[in-house]
Amino acid sequence: MTKYALVGDVGGTNARLALCDIASGEISQAKTYSGLDYPSLEAVIRVYLEEHKVEVKDGCIAIACPITGDWVAMTNHTWAFSIAEMKKNLGFSHLEIINDFTAVSMAIPMLKKEHLIQFGGAEPIEGKPIAVYGAGTGLGVAHLVHVDKRWVSLPGEGGHVDFAPNSEEEGIILEILRAEIGHVSAERVLSGPGLVNLYRAIVKADNRLPENLKPKDITERALADSCTDCRRALSLFCVIMGRFGGNLALNLGTFGGVFIAGGIVPRFLEFFKASGFRAAFEDKGRFKEYVHDIPVYLIVHDNPGLLGSGAHLRQTLGHIL
């Protein structure tokens, strides 16, 4: 008889829950719930389990916020809870709460070739460290290493490191944004809101007033080639994505590959392919040759957060991935 675990991927707006076959890791019965409709994460889980008429005793939920102890308070939502208390209330034997990019990193060993699009570099070297990052509402970052037949995710808040300009144009943008918001992290330029910041700074640098555009507007105008400022912003976004990815590659010698997740890049895939992304990734001066062969992949799997939550839980329960 198939034994299932509950897996989830929870952001500031929605909670996506599913079942994971503990033996195979296969994800099924995925359903998305609006976080605004429920008073707590526990309430959503109870509704899901009741709707699917399934009894589970193990679970792993990925959440878009730092996980530093038993008490979890979501960054972009009012939900807050004790892991131990929720585990007890649900009657679970195991309940893991992990960072969303911990989950994405743990999905990587489970991905197939059709889930990846490669951008330069050679073949990955088996057993070498891996980096994963992704722009969405924010900028998530994690690393993954293989130790004693186990995958170990190294989460953190790498999206909040300083934005490091490497051109005159980027330096001007930094100064404009610093005057507006103070500390300018990488996330301030590599995210949906970050794309807006780039557009606004480009226009303001020319002593003009920017329009009140959303990320979707900027992307659409750039792809339609109907707005030079929007196209410059999107081009610069791709270049800075490359610089940041190259930095991750240098940090840990990620010859196992650098992986891009998140919902933004797939929206302009052909533009991204033709952009200065890879050149910026390799633009590391004396260490250009060091990163030259490191492959970069775009993850195109529909639910890497759910897949990775399942992988994390299965490994915790003793399975080898």
From Swiss-Prot:
InterPro entries: ATPase_NBD, Bacterial_glucokinase, Glucokinase. This is Glucokinase. Belongs to the bacterial glucokinase family. ATP binds at G8, D9, V10, G11, G12, T13. The lineage of its organism: Bacteria, Pseudomonadati, Pseudomonadota, Gammaproteobacteria, Enterobacterales. It comes from the Bacteria. One of its GO terms (molecular function) is glucokinase activity. GO terms for cellular component: cytosol. Its EC number is 2.7.1.2. The gene is glk. GO terms for biological process: glycolytic process. The keyword Kinase applies.
